[in-house]
Every structure is written in structure tokens, then in C-alpha cells.
Amino acid sequence: ECKWYLGTCSKDGDCCKHLQCHSNYE
């Protein structure tokens, strides 16, 4: 699951591919 630790990113989003998400990736 691609989910932000302190965000509202979901696995359906492309945020997992963003470096910002990787930093807050749970």
C-alpha cells in the first residue's frame, strides 16, 4: 500500500512515485 504517514496519499495515486512520498512513505 502506498500511503502517506502525514498526508492523504492513497495507493491509487501516483504520489508513491514522488520523492516527497518516499520521504513520508509508511
UniProtKB/Swiss-Prot annotation:
Q: Listed GO cellular component terms?
A: extracellular region
Q: What SUPFAM superfamilies does this protein map onto? A: omega toxin-like
Where expressed (tissue)?
A: Expressed by the venom gland.
What are the disulfide bonds? 2-16, 9-21
Localization recorded for this chain is: Secreted
Name the Pfam families for this protein. Toxin_12
Instruction: List UniProt keywords, sorted A-Z.
Output: Disulfide bond, Ion channel impairing toxin, Knottin, Secreted, Toxin
Q: Does the keyword Disulfide bond apply?
A: yes
Chief localization:
secreted
GO molecular function annotation = ion channel inhibitor activity; toxin activity
- Recorded family membership: Belongs to the neurotoxin 10 (Hwtx-1) family. 17 (Hntx-9) subfamily.
Query: Can you quote the domain comment?
Result: The presence of a 'disulfide through disulfide knot' structurally defines this protein as a knottin.
Primary role: Ion channel inhibitor.
Q: What is this protein called?
A: Hainantoxin F1-31.97
Organism in which the protein naturally occurs:
Cyriopagopus hainanus (Chinese bird spider)
